[in-house]
Amino acid sequence: EREEAPGYHSTGRSAAMFLETYGNAIIRDLTVASRLFFADPPAGFSESPLWAPRGTLTIARADQRHTLREAVTQARCHVPAIEEVDGAEARRLNPVLRSDYVAAATFDAEARELDVHAIHGGYLRGLTGRGGEVVTDAEVTALTRNAGAWTAETPVGVFTAPVVVNAA
């Protein structure tokens, strides 16, 4: 880990929503495949739930209705319950929306807010529980490959492994 603590960047980013309608087909398939893990994580992974119901609205102006309908059609492959709502219903769900701007919206009641800290902590416990170690303040200064192994040089030591993952 380059930073002084694990998760310095990853736990503070805005990827804290579970949205089966987000991204391209590959991302959506990966998201759908991970649903069971978040709904029912392995025993001991976390003492608290990994997600909570949140729901999301995606709004559209009148000139964007066609695009919104296309998005709803595509989204229903993964989230059959996604709803297209009119502007009045969108404003009922979120009263701060302007009536002169919002003509329609999608409402995804299946969207969930992820507990990033619980997820990150669960993975860290899993790593260390299996004998793994997290080394911090270890920015890679050189990376070489020799005889099927990678060698990473850092200010705190040299590490060798058959696989390197750039998780930045």
Question: Where is each model-derived feature located?
Answer:
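Glycine-rich FAD pyrophosphate-binding loop
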Residues: 1-11
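Short beta-to-alpha linker loops that shape the active-site pocket of alpha/beta-hydrolase fold enzymes
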Residues: 3-5, 90, 123
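Short, flexible, mixed-charge acidic loops at enzyme active sites
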Residues: 9-15, 97
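Dinucleotide-binding Rossmann-like beta1-alpha1 core, especially the glycine-rich loop
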Residues: 15-93
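Well-ordered beta-strand positions enriched in small/hydrophobic/aromatic, beta-favoring residues
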Residues: 18, 57, 105-106, 152
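Acidic/polar active-site rim loop that often engages polyanionic ligands
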Residues: 73, 101-102
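Helical element adjacent to the flavin cofactor pocket in flavoenzyme catalytic cores
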Residues: 106-163, 167
